Amino acid sequence: MGDVKVFTGTIVHATDLEPMQILENMAVGVLNNKIVFVEPASELATLKTKYKIQDTREITMTQSQFLMPGLVDTHIHAPQFPNTGIHLVLPLLEWLDNYTFPTEAKFADGKFAQYVYGAAVDRLLRCGTTTATYFGSLHLEGTKILGDTVHARGQRALVGKVNMIANCPSYYQEASLEDSLRETEEFILYIKNLKSDLVLPIVTPRSAPTCPKEHMERLAQLALKHDCHIQSHICESRSENDWVQELFPWSTSYADVYGTVGLLTDKTVMAHGVWLKDEEVALLKESGTGVAHCPNSNLSLRSGLCDVRRLLSAGLKVGLGTDCSGGYSPSILNSLRQAVLMSKTISTMTEGYESITLQEAFRLATLGGAKVICMEDRIGNFEVGKEFDALLVDVATMGTPLDIFPEDTTEEKIEKFLYNGDDRNILQVYVAGRNVMDKTR
């Protein structure tokens, strides 16, 4: 047996039964990239003998530190990263035309792509995002650079080359349907040839308005051929919904368009879902499609208030997304907070409404996201056998937004981090057992 690294102290994670489970005085053993035990620290002497653990492989957490699963961002636009925190003055469709498409068009320049993607992935890792579901741009070479960057940094990710040939600017659209399909398949094979357990391709029609019916059908066939994930947008704003109905008059809904062309699968991630009708929710549930809830973006672009309680009650898989740059923060901690506040806002307008709790939002940010991307057998919490994607958090680090007092309980320290903490409180980031960011060195 190889060397086992052991973390002792407080851990917090989510399970299907408990949205937030806090376990104190625990020992977590990691062999290579997987969790081999989660036991009371009182059993450590026995565990050391059983696993031949050397004292130098033990990391003892202080009373202000805890271990939590890595955060999962189920929806982010990597080429929009330069716009994060600016240009949020227009609603969705006008915002795309005026700010987003011009920025994404710049990624035809490989040097620009390399610089921006390096900054984006580094930022997300510092913010604790161990897994990200990335929209790239429509540029094949530029999106290969995104895949290479993620691979080199050690982040877990789904990476997609955007497909769009209709209803988009002439300076930023693919030449033809055949070119789009050819380059998408080339990109899929390129990512697969990285032979990485962490970086996977994801088929990415930008949205129904930008992809004619045959285009979406053939992208769905490509995904099936290569056993790929799929991602797109759905029911983000009312004006978008109306537009989809005009473009696809034969359909009964936005979700029906995707269902008809074969894009709704159990490996599909649909971003937003703000304006889903009941029959659309049922269709997503039947197909196993997950929803990326992006509350910051939905508020910033005035798209609407997504009723996450409704989606969860219907049995949908739901995770959180930053949707940079529609969302102004690249941190899933921000999405977690905004999700709670959005749900509380809905509760002020709906008698008897049960808003989601901070603990439930924590589960969305970790295990929920893992389920949306069909990786809950590998990541999302600290179950034995799963890969070790984790954050070492310290709520007492100097110069952070947190104030900790002697009477604070462990639960209160964790709540303070979730509501007020930031990347300065995250000391170490692990992906598949590898330390990819370390502030303790």
What role is predicted for each listed range?
Residues M1-Q54, I59, Q65:
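N-terminal metal-binding scaffold of metallo-dependent hydrolase/deaminase domains
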Residues D16, E387-R441:
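C-terminal cap of metal-dependent C-N hydrolases
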Residues F66, T84-Q155, S180-S196:
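Alpha-helical scaffold segments that flank or form the walls of functional sites
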Residues P82-A113, A166-L177, S237-K267, S287-G290, ...:
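Active-site gating loops and adjacent loop-to-helix segments of metal-dependent hydrolytic enzymes
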Residues E141-G273:
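Metal-coordinating catalytic core of metallo-dependent amide/deamination hydrolases
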Residues G154-R156, A220-H229, L263-D266, L283-A292, ...:
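Glycine-enriched alpha-helix->loop->beta-strand junction motifs that scaffold or abut catalytic
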Residues T260-K267, R309-L402:
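His/Asp/Glu-enriched, well-ordered alpha-helical/loop segment
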